């Protein structure tokens, strides 16, 4: 088994440019040394509830949040820290100028993780001209568990079912 610090040298993490800080990311960055020092972080029902409550507490039904929390903690009591290391030190994790395939970026109106400014900058840098950006009203970060979840499915279905361009000039 390897330790996360073997993959992420401390000097590389601290010198990597990061995205604009949302309040949630700014708070999370304070814990970056802990995330680097451990391979896993606890996954609790309280944490799952915080995902839904931190940005805009009324975007999801309480019974949906509770059912989701129960299902997640039934799978495992911890999750890898790698995604937190990446979001605290390496955003964006891919170079948008190398993305040449059709791309859809969806952002919840109340998302406290992915800032509008960061996503729009990323979107503008995409190499593909076949791209769409959409803001989903009344949705925070966990879009599939929100009250407006049908909007998510509609946007995805529309994107994947649209006809290919006849002319590209």
Show the residue positions of the predicted features.
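Short beta-strand/loop motif that positions the catalytic acidic residue
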Residues: 99, 105-107, 111
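Alpha/beta-hydrolase-fold serine-hydrolase catalytic core, especially in secreted/extracellular enzymes
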Residues: 21-25, 30, 129, 147, ...
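Hydrophobic "lid"/C-terminal helical patch
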Residues: 156, 160
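Alpha/beta-hydrolase
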Residues: 10-94, 98-101
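Conserved alpha/beta-hydrolase "acid-adjacent" motif
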Residues: 112-118
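Active-site nucleophile loop of the alpha/beta-hydrolase fold
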Residues: 1-9
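Catalytic histidine-centered segment of alpha/beta-hydrolase-like enzymes
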Residues: 133, 139-153
């Amino acid at each position: 088994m390897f330790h996360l610090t073997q993959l992420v040298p401390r000097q590389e993490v601290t010198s990597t440019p990061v995205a604009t800080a949302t309040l949630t990311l700014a708070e999370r960055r304070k814990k970056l040394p802990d995330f680097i020092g451990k391979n896993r972080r606890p996954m609790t029902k309280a944490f799952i509830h915080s995902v839904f409550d931190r940005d805009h507490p009324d975007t999801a039904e309480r019974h949906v949040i509770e059912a989701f929390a129960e299902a997640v903690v039934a799978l495992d009591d911890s999750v890898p820290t790698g995604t937190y290391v990446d979001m605290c030190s390496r955003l964006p994790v891919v170079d948008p100028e190398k993305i040449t395939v059709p791309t859809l970026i969806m952002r919840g109106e109340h998302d406290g993780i992915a800032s509008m400014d960061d996503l729009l900058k990323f979107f503008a840098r995409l190499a593909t001209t076949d791209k769409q950006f959409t803001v989903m009203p009344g949705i925070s970060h966990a879009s599939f568990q929100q009250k407006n979840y049908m909007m998510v499915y509609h946007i995805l279905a529309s994107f994947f079912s649209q006809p290919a361009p006849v002319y590209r000039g």
